[in-house]
A protein has these predicted regions:
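Active-site-proximal helix-loop elements at catalytic-domain edges
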Residues: 19-58
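M16/MPP (pitrilysin/insulinase) zinc-metallopeptidase core fold and M16-derived inactive scaffolds
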Residues: 46-110
Length: 110
């Protein structure tokens, strides 16, 4: 089942901003049809994602302990949240350590 993901805008926020006191990257995405498919509704999604980005297994997420994000994936979490963790892990792998992320919906679907 093909899905489209569109980056609507992105910007780098230097120093304190409306999200955090640190510099941050703000990205607005249109998840399209992905918005209607939590992680637990896509067969094999969690295992394939963890095979591609194994560092996600250490993410705490809201559970507060290592593996918390994997628990959320298996229980079902939204794709915006999944992308947030993927971006955090990819930034860490690129030598730009971070642990902060927030996912918010807007008044427009997608």
């Amino acid at each position: 089942m093909p899905f489209a993901l569109n980056v609507l805008r992105h910007r780098f926020l230097l120093g304190p901003n409306c999200w955090t006191y640190r510099s941050a990257m703000e990205v607005w995405l249109d998840l399209g049809e992905l918005e209607q498919h939590p992680s637990n509704t896509l067969p094999g999604f969690t295992d394939r994602l963890l095979a591609l980005i194994p560092g996600l297994q250490a993410h705490h997420c809201g559970v507060g302990e290592e593996g918390g994000f994997v628990e959320r994936l298996r229980d079902g979490t939204w794709m915006g949240h999944v992308l947030e963790h993927c971006v955090i892990e990819l930034l860490n792998l690129a030598g730009m350590p971070t642990g902060f992320g927030q996912t918010r919906s807007t008044s427009q679907s997608g």
